[in-house]
Amino acid sequence: MIRKAFVMQVNPDAHEEYQRRHNPIWPELEAVLKDHGAHHYAIYLDKERHLLFATVEIESEARWEAVASTEVCQRWWKYMREVMPSNPDNSPLSAELKEVFYLA
């Protein structure tokens, strides 16, 4: 498995709405993530800085990257753009983080 971590932002007035929209996520989005080899996906909120820290284990970079082109992911991004800063294609602004320590 490949471990990934990334950081995103949530609008200051949208913390509760962001969480509501993820509990639960759409069943079809969950299915796409699993079908594309995502496991142990978690998102954490830093309320003071309005940051989202996400971790996920993936089976392959290619399969993970393919999620973005699915119809359900495109709909999800459009749905979420109201609560978080987004790119012109509606994908959330995000930065991948480099792993500097891991304890198995």
UniProtKB/Swiss-Prot annotation:
The lineage of its organism: Bacteria, Pseudomonadati, Pseudomonadota, Gammaproteobacteria, Enterobacterales. Belongs to the rhamnose mutarotase family. The active site is at residue 22. It is found in: Cytoplasm. One of its GO terms (molecular function) is L-rhamnose mutarotase activity. It catalyses: alpha-L-rhamnose = beta-L-rhamnose. Homodimer. Involved in the anomeric conversion of L-rhamnose. GO terms for cellular component: cytoplasm. This is L-rhamnose mutarotase. HAMAP family: L_rham_rotase. Keywords: Carbohydrate metabolism, Cytoplasm, Isomerase, Rhamnose metabolism. Substrate binds at residues 18, 41, 76-77. Pathway: Carbohydrate metabolism; L-rhamnose metabolism. Pfam families: rhaM. InterPro entries: Dimeric_a/b-barrel (IPR011008), L-rhamnose_mutarotase (IPR013448), Rham/fucose_mutarotase (IPR008000). Gene3D superfamilies: 3.30.70.100. Its EC number is 5.1.3.32. Signal peptide: none annotated. GO terms for biological process: rhamnose catabolic process.
